[in-house]
Structure formats: structure tokens, C-alpha cells
Amino acid sequence: MLAGMPSLSHEEQQEAVERIHKFMSEGMSSGEAIALVAAEIRERHQNDPQAMAIFEDHDFDEHTESDYRRDDEPDADDIEDPYEG
């Protein structure tokens, strides 16, 4: 998830966005481009004391789908989509 992502300045955020756009313009998927840039940022800030874990994947392991929705909320599969088909 967002484990170990450091706080970035506005300028660093802009540079990251530009790199993501560059990778995408070269044919890389948005997900791959984001993952690559995030890995680069994590590596660059590896010993940065501000880079602290925000979420760890195991934080979500003990929860089930019903923990994240109301009991009266219909499943997405049960909702008729007028645009489908």
C-alpha cells in the first residue's frame, strides 16, 4: 500500500507526475509507471526518517468484505447496469 512513502515537496510531486506521464507516453501502463516511480522514490528516501509506514498490507488481512460496507448495501453483481451489454 503506502508503506514507507516519504512526504514529498510540491516540486518532487510534480517531478514524479512528469516521470509517470513520460513512461505512459512511451507505452507503459499507468499502474506500471506509478509503481516504478514509487519504487524509485522509496529507494531515494530509504534512510529518510520522515518515510514512515502509513499502511501495511497485513493491516487489512484480518478484515472481510462485510467490514467495509453496510449490511443493507447490495453487492455490485446484484445491481442491474442499464449500460451493460
UniProtKB/Swiss-Prot annotation:
InterPro entries: UPF0181. Pfam families: UPF0181 (PF03701). Residues 50-85 are annotated as: Disordered. Residues 55-72 have a biased composition (Basic and acidic residues). Signal peptide: none annotated. Residues 73-85 have a biased composition (Acidic residues). It comes from the Bacteria. HAMAP family: UPF0181. Belongs to the UPF0181 family. This is UPF0181 protein YPO1774/y2534/YP_1619. The lineage of its organism: Bacteria, Pseudomonadati, Pseudomonadota, Gammaproteobacteria, Enterobacterales.
